UniProtKB/Swiss-Prot annotation:
Keyword DNA damage: no
Catalytic activity: aldehydo-D-ribose 5-phosphate = D-ribulose 5-phosphate
Annotated organism of origin: Streptococcus sanguinis (strain SK36)
Summary of subunit composition and partner proteins: Homodimer.
CDD domains named in the record: RPI_A
Residues annotated for substrate binding in this entry: T26, G27, S28, T29, D82, G83, A84, D85, K95, G96, G97, G98, K122
The protein's name: Ribose-5-phosphate isomerase A
Gene Ontology molecular functions: ribose-5-phosphate isomerase activity
């Protein structure tokens, strides 16, 4: 499967042309896309400017000699390629397994052509088996946790190295174990109105293409937005 992820990342890079501003995603599959962009710059003379979705991706891109800009210095991103943790039949997705959901969404919103690269295990009928990440400010996080608990969302603070995980934006992540999300659009709206929630991992009706790596090869699926 790792080789298929690599092939999917390389396939996604075909949508990148010189002169573009490119969003570089975060995660195991996006990693291969970033590597391929670095190779094309070095070997093919590809000329692009990139914005990144995490400190991890920034470090990778810098090591490959990919020119970077801040998202604040661009008005529009031509194409962004990123991974996803789940994608449903309506092309809504859950992202944030790597903890970069806020920056990923900030880059996705001004993107003209948004592409996800996933393996076939991520394609589901309905979202929710993967825990939904909710990024929250540190102040009042315990109160929010209890609120989610009362609602039956089975919350858990994300941890790393036996401590609470802190995002690049210095926030906590509460993962919600929802089982099935019957209406991801409505649930996203509910979370959008919770004070203290900075962002959540529901990416509804945002993606344009999904490149799926499976045992039989690669599929490029077009979202009907």
């Amino acid at each position: 499967m790792e080789n298929l992820k690599k092939l999917a990342g390389i396939k996604a890079a075909e949508f990148v042309q010189s002169g573009m501003i490119v969003g570089l995603g975060t995660g195991s599959t996006a990693y291969y896309f970033v590597e391929e962009i670095g190779r094309r710059i070095k070997e093919e003379g590809l000329q692009i400017t990139a914005v990144t979705t995490s400190s991890v991706t920034s470090k990778q891109a810098e090591g490959l000699g990919i020119p970077l800009k801040s998202i604040d210095d661009v008005d529009q991103v031509d194409v962004t390629v990123d991974g996803a943790d789940e994608v449903d039949s309506a092309f809504n997705g859950i992202k944030g397994g790597g903890g970069a959901l806020l920056m990923e969404k900030v880059v996705a919103v001004p993107t003209k052509h948004y592409i996800w690269v996933v393996d076939e295990s991520k394609m589901v009928e309905k979202l929710g088996a993967f825990k939904l990440p909710v990024e929250v400010v540190q102040y009042g996080a315990e109160q929010l946790f209890r609120r989610f608990e009362r609602a039956g969302y089975k919350p858990a603070f994300r941890e790393k190295d036996d401590q609470r995980f802190v995002t690049d934006m210095q926030n906590f992540i509460i993962d919600l174990d929802l089982g099935v999300i019957e209406n991801s659009v409505e649930f996203a709206q509910e979370l959008d109105h919770v004070v203290g929630v900075v962002e959540h991992g529901l990416f509804n009706q945002m993606v344009d293409k999904v490149i799926v790596a499976g045992k039989s090869g690669l599929q490029v699926l077009e979202a009907n937005k």
